[in-house]
């Protein structure tokens, strides 16, 4: 009699231990923050390191309007904003507070808006020199679930998820169960 292997014997951990990318600058940042995460007791460095491992989809961009909104919070006005990802411009805002923003990259419009307000744009390795323990910083993340693809995930009855279809219109995906005139409507 043998043993029934009812579950997978070698379970892969879903967590990344290194970035998938071959970007040498990213690898240098990983090396730097691996050292800081090990040698300092600050959880900030561990958070930044884990964020550096993420895929581009899981590192959505942060707009300058989101940064401006975050800085309006109580006690956040003079903190350094940290974004492990891209900082993008927002044409809808004209007033931007003077602040220091550290990020992986900036779009030209976002950089211009931050500098014009009297702030500065720094890289994450410059941040490590200024705040090795992440003191006086504010970490921001972009919206992960704003992608169009997320509308289709978890399809099923009563989930309100969008079906994957090529044609859209009044009668597409609106038959039995979706219209009163076709049997019933949920």
Curated annotation (Swiss-Prot):
InterPro entries: Ribosomal_eL18 (IPR000039), Ribosomal_eL18/eL18-A/B/_CS (IPR021132), Ribosomal_uL15/eL18 (IPR021131), Ribosomal_uL15/eL18_sf (IPR036227). Pfam families: Ribosomal_L18. It comes from Saccharomyces cerevisiae (strain ATCC 204508 / S288c) (Baker's yeast). PROSITE patterns: RIBOSOMAL_L18E (PS01106). Component of the ribosome, a large ribonucleoprotein complex responsible for the synthesis of proteins in the cell. The small ribosomal subunit (SSU) binds messenger RNAs (mRNAs) and translates the encoded message by selecting cognate aminoacyl-transfer RNA (tRNA) molecules. The large subunit (LSU) contains the ribosomal catalytic site termed the peptidyl transferase center (PTC), which catalyzes the formation of peptide bonds, thereby polymerizing the amino acids delivered by tRNAs into a polypeptide chain. Belongs to the eukaryotic ribosomal protein eL18 family. GO terms for biological process: cytoplasmic translation. There are 2 genes for eL18 in yeast. Gene3D superfamilies: 3.100.10.10. This is Large ribosomal subunit protein eL18A. The modification N6,N6,N6-trimethyllysine is found at residue 50. GO terms for molecular function: RNA binding; structural constituent of ribosome. It comes from the Eukaryota. Component of the large ribosomal subunit (LSU). Mature yeast ribosomes consist of a small (40S) and a large (60S) subunit. The 40S small subunit contains 1 molecule of ribosomal RNA (18S rRNA) and 33 different proteins (encoded by 57 genes). The large 60S subunit contains 3 rRNA molecules (25S, 5.8S and 5S rRNA) and 46 different proteins (encoded by 81 genes). eL18 interacts with NAP1. Its main location: cytoplasm. Keywords: Cytoplasm, Isopeptide bond, Methylation, Ribonucleoprotein, Ribosomal protein, Ubl conjugation. There is a cross-link at residue 116 (Glycyl lysine isopeptide (Lys-Gly) (interchain with G-Cter in ubiquitin)). GO terms for cellular component: cytosol; cytosolic large ribosomal subunit. It is found in: Cytoplasm.
């Amino acid at each position: 009699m043998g043993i029934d292997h009812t579950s997978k014997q070698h379970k892969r951990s879903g967590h990344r231990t290194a970035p998938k990318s071959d970007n040498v600058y990213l690898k240098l940042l990983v090396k730097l923050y691996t050292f800081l995460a090990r040698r300092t007791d600050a959880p900030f460095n561990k958070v930044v390191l884990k964020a550096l491992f993420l895929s581009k989809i899981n590192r959505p961009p942060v707009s300058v309007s989101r940064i401006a909104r975050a800085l309006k919070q109580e006690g956040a006005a003079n903190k350094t904003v940290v974004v492990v990802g891209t900082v993008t411009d927002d044409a809808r805002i004209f007033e931007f507070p003077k602040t220091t923003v550290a990020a992986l990259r900036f779009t030209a419009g976002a950089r211009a808006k931050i500098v014009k307000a009297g702030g500065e744009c720094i890289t994450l390795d410059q941040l490590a020199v200024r705040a090795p323990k992440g003191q006086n910083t504010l970490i921001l993340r972009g919206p992960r679930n704003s992608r169009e693809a997320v509308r289709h995930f978890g399809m099923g009855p009563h989930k309100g998820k969008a079906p994957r279809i090529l044609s859209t219109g009044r009668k597409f995906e609106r038959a039995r169960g979706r219209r009163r005139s076709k049997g019933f409507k949920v």
